[in-house]
Amino acid sequence: MQIFLKTEDEINLMRKANQLVGLTLAELGKHIKPGVTTLQLDRIAEEFIRDHGAVPTFKNFPNPFGEPFPANICTSINDVVVHGIPSEDDVLREGDIISIDCGTLLDGFNGDSCYTFCVGEVHPEVKQLLSVTKQSLYLGIENAVAGNHVGDIGFSIQSYCESHGYGVVRELVGHGIGKAMHEDPPVPNLGRRGNGVMLKDGMCIAIEPMITMGNRKIGLLPDKWGIATVDHQPAAHFEHTIVVRKGKAEILSSFQEVEHLEGQNI
């Protein structure tokens, strides 16, 4: 395992890439409504990212079968946990939730973040799933400080979500990030305190709880990309890229613009 600690100059570049991801998610949030297709969202994202001098990282990213991802963002609706492929056939409907995972490459460094949006009015139980998942992300971030371990992050996420009766996906994890989208160490959403890689100042990692309303079991869709819950219950996914610091982690990505937009729509 090779972990790259980032310099302050490198962290500044990563901050810019991640801020662009936040702006892209907010731009997409303006268009999330019934009748919109996920392919439309993908085109909006690509244009926005490229207009800001960056490249969509996910385009042509290979899966374990060596097949390139055919789109610019991942659009995962309802029971699809991750890696949903945008399509003109996927039309958003009132009451859906959609997780949009977005990555950018800017000045040689990557940004990565995900947000689960509501499409119109969503059932209160589903809203609760989103709320708990987002809160678990911040609990994980609170534990991402120098001297702690990767297991401290996973433990805080797992214990909080399972206390609410939700399933924590085991097979999908967070990751280190920098010049490459996926670097060491893996960052699972479960674990035991004091276990795993020790966190050091300057480590940049993406923390991303993927939480299910029902059974935690998942399966690969026929397109070899999308991964969905086997019981077809909804799943939520929130992700921030952070840098490990002494005392308190620094969040490099941002939900501020998205949440401001959501506040205007209440």
Residue ranges and their predicted role:
Residues 1-266:
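Active-site neighborhoods and metal-handling regions in enzymes and metal-associated proteins
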